[in-house]
Amino acid sequence: MIQHFQPISAFKKDPYDKIIAFPKPRDAEIKKRIIELKKLGVSHVSFTGPLRIEKCQILGKGYVGMVVLAKQNNKVVALKIRRIDSPRKNMTNEAKLLKIANKINIGPKFIKNSKNFLIMEYIDGEKIIDWAKKSETKAK
């Protein structure tokens, strides 16, 4: 996957603003979240991945958030961004569960979290669901 990194200030511009404050970006929320990213040490983002939202490619989208590639302290990481319409008020519980899974070597390694973001190890490769489907087919 080609990784073109942009400064996190790119989130201020259309269409990237829809990723940091999905689904309805507002300037005040975008500014607040960019400050939050800076405090976490995130400097750059890359809009690449198999999923397309608006005109942006991202790694993933779910019920709680969107996942993009980012740089934190010059290291490539996966950045989960809490959706503004998420029923969860923060990423604390998700971070806690990831730390528990990490204790038995499951999942990407937890790095850091804040109210709206979860930073974890980026593992380049096949999605686990796709791998499992292939393995199931081979087993038959």
Regions found by a protein language model. Give the residues of each.
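ATP-binding glycine-rich loop module of kinase domains
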Residues: Q57-T92
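Short coil/loop residues immediately preceding or within conserved phosphate-binding loops
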Residues: E54, G65, N105
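Generic structural signal for beta-strand residues in well-ordered domains
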Residues: S46, G60, Q72, I100-K103, ...
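Ser/Thr- (and often Asn-) enriched beta-sheet segments in non-cytosolic proteins
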Residues: R52, K71, Y122-D124
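Juxta-kinase regulatory segment immediately upstream of eukaryotic protein kinase catalytic domains
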Residues: I2-Q57
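A conserved alpha-helical element in kinase catalytic cores
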Residues: I81-S114, S135
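Conserved structural core of kinase catalytic domains
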Residues: P108-A139
